[in-house]
């Protein structure tokens, strides 16, 4: 299995609900360890740059407005098949279509306020991680499992 890194964002609705720890715990329980974490308020320019791929889509303005409406938690998660595992833990983009036990099914309210973002491919993960975290800010470490 390949050890990968992926970007995960706890969106403003997740921060506002006070579930940061619960979300990080779900990733850790499934073998994804955070190797970089930052709580920040995205600027309009940062959000527009990050979501530039959606610029022509009708929801772009609302997405940028939402992502700048409050603090977010930016994380780099590391583990075996991190991209696919992260997406499995998050669940479908639309919480109504997400499987039971996923973050979006359990915490999200709708497709716009769906609590978390995760990279959709290994290629995009590299781009997204580098957008928010220069390599120097990412710290590798080994887990010591509790007995």
From Swiss-Prot:
Which residues does the annotation say bind ATP?
Answer: 11, 59, 87, 93, 104, 114
A cellular-component GO term for this protein: cytoplasm
The catalytic site is made up of 117
Q: Where in the cell is it found?
A: Cytoplasm
Query: Among its keywords, does the record have Acetylation?
Result: no
Gene Ontology MF annotations: ATP binding; metal ion binding; nucleoside diphosphate kinase activity
Please write the reaction equations for the catalytic activity of this protein.
Answer: a 2'-deoxyribonucleoside 5'-diphosphate + ATP = a 2'-deoxyribonucleoside 5'-triphosphate + ADP; a ribonucleoside 5'-diphosphate + ATP = a ribonucleoside 5'-triphosphate + ADP
Name of one Pfam family that matches: NDK
Q: What keywords were assigned to this record?
A: ATP-binding, Cytoplasm, Kinase, Magnesium, Metal-binding, Nucleotide metabolism, Nucleotide-binding, Phosphoprotein, Transferase
For this protein, the Enzyme Commission number is: 2.7.4.6
Give the EC class as a word: transferase
User: So which domain of life are we looking at?
Assistant: Bacteria
Q: List, separated by semicolons, the cofactors it needs.
A: Mg(2+)
**Biological processes, Gene Ontology terms:** CTP biosynthetic process; GTP biosynthetic process; UTP biosynthetic process
Q: How does it assemble?
A: Homotetramer.
Q: Belongs to which family?
A: Belongs to the NDK family.
Give the protein's biological function: Major role in the synthesis of nucleoside triphosphates other than ATP. The ATP gamma phosphate is transferred to the NDP beta phosphate via a ping-pong mechanism, using a phosphorylated active-site intermediate.
What NCBIfam families does the entry give?
Answer: PRK00668.1
Query: What is the protein's name according to its record?
Result: Nucleoside diphosphate kinase
Originating organism: Anaeromyxobacter sp. (strain K)
User: Taxonomically, what lineage is the organism?
Assistant: Bacteria, Pseudomonadati, Myxococcota, Myxococcia, Myxococcales
| Record gene name | ndk
């Amino acid at each position: 299995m390949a050890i990968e890194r992926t970007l995960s964002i706890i969106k403003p609705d997740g921060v506002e609900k006070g579930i940061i720890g619960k979300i990080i715990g779900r990733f850790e329980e499934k073998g994804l360890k955070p190797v970089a974490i930052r709580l920040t308020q995205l600027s309009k320019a940062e959000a527009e740059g990050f979501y530039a791929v959606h610029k022509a889509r009708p929801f772009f303005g609302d997405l940028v407005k939402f992502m700048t409406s409050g603090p977010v938690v930016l994380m780099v998660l590391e583990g075996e098949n991190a991209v696919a595992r992260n997406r499995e833990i998050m669940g479908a983009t639309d919480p109504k279509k997400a499987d039971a036990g996923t973050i979006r099914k359990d915490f999200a309210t709708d497709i716009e306020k769906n609590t978390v973002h995760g990279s959709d491919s290994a290629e995009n993960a590299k781009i997204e991680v580098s957008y928010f975290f220069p390599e120097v800010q990412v710290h590798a470490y080994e887990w010591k499992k509790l007995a």
